[in-house]
């Protein structure tokens, strides 16, 4: 009976250790993905600002000195789009 109890306790301990390790790994992956998304968003903002500086159909997408598109223009997929 003592052997069975010892085996059960050791099995539970191993299960808890593996579960904790898996949880840490998933948490680490979540943090990495979040950082990657933040970087991607910053890159998109930069690309959007850059593309809106380009003139489309002879008209600027945004006024000089403005940080956002105006005059009915919006940045979509790195292009100036008339709304």
Swiss-Prot record:
This is U3-theraphotoxin-Cg1a. The lineage of its organism: Eukaryota, Metazoa, Ecdysozoa, Arthropoda, Chelicerata. GO terms for molecular function: ion channel regulator activity; toxin activity. Expressed by the venom gland. Residues 24-44 form a propeptide. One of its GO terms (cellular component) is extracellular region. It is found in: Secreted. Keywords: Disulfide bond, Ion channel impairing toxin, Knottin, Secreted, Signal, Toxin. InterPro entries: Hwtx-2-like. Coiled coil: none annotated. Probable ion channel inhibitor. The keyword Phosphoprotein does not apply. Disulfide bonds join 48-61, 52-75, 69-80. Residues 1-23 form the signal peptide. Belongs to the neurotoxin 12 (Hwtx-2) family. 03 (juruin) subfamily.
């Amino acid at each position: 009976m003592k052997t069975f109890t010892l085996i059960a306790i050791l099995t539970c301990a191993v299960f808890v250790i593996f579960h904790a390790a898996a949880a840490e790994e998933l948490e680490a992956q979540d943090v990495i993905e979040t950082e990657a998304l933040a970087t991607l968003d910053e890159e998109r903002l930069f690309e959007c600002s850059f593309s809106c500086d380009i003139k489309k159909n002879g008209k600027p997408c945004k006024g000089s000195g403005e940080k956002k598109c105006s005059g009915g223009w919006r940045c979509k997929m790195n292009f100036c789009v008339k709304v």
